């Protein structure tokens, strides 16, 4: 059985086209940590390493919980403000970050990120499980004020 030049050309062309389709399929399924669909990179395996989410907000008291969402206990949640710009850098990392906070939401898939606010993969909502006791809130607020004062003193102190 002889293969003509035309048949070889068609076969090569078909192989190249198939290779190109596989390449496009592989790159189209890639996504950043924060904007993947459910079951994407956010579906973290228990054995996969994670890191703490980046600090954000005034004096770094919050944590990034989305590409332009920063939440913290004494802070609440900031969305789309200059303080949240640092959260865009979360998309650049290939290692997912773990949002700290008590579990909340349906099937405990979310985390309490601020007083009364629970965030899951793609949304935040009010949740009574995330309410902070007034005594505990006062203690956290006083501790944050003290740390802020110490930081300012250290920055303003001139060493000889």
Curated annotation (Swiss-Prot):
One of its GO terms (cellular component) is secretory granule. Keywords: Amidation, Disulfide bond, G-protein coupled receptor impairing toxin, Secreted, Signal, Toxin. It comes from the Eukaryota. Disulfide bonds join 31-36, 53-97, 56-70, 64-87, 71-77, 104-118, 112-130, 119-124. Expressed by the venom gland. GO terms for molecular function: neurohypophyseal hormone activity; toxin activity. Residues 40-47 form a propeptide. Belongs to the vasopressin/oxytocin family. Targets vasopressin-oxytocin related receptors. The letter 'R' in the name 'Conopressin-R' proposed by Kumar and colleagues stands for the eighth residue, which differs between conopressins. The cysteine framework of the conopressin is C-C. This is Conopressin/conophysin, isoform 2.
């Amino acid at each position: 059985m002889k293969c003509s030049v035309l048949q070889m050309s068609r076969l090569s062309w078909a192989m190249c086209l198939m290779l190109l389709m596989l390449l496009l399929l592989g790159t189209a399924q890639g996504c950043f940590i924060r904007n993947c669909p459910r079951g994407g990179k956010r579906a973290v395996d228990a054995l996969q390493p994670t890191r703490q989410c980046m600090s954000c907000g005034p004096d770094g008291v919050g944590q990034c919980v989305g590409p332009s969402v920063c939440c913290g206990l004494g802070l609440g949640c900031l969305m789309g403000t200059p303080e949240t710009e640092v959260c865009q850098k979360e998309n650049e990392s290939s290692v997912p970050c773990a949002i700290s906070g008590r579990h909340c939401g349906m099937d405990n898939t979310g985390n309490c990120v601020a007083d009364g606010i629970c965030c899951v993969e793609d949304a935040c909502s009010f949740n009574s499980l995330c309410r902070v006791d007034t005594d505990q809130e006062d203690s956290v607020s006083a501790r944050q004020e003290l740390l802020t004062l110490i930081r300012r003193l250290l920055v303003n102190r001139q060493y000889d």
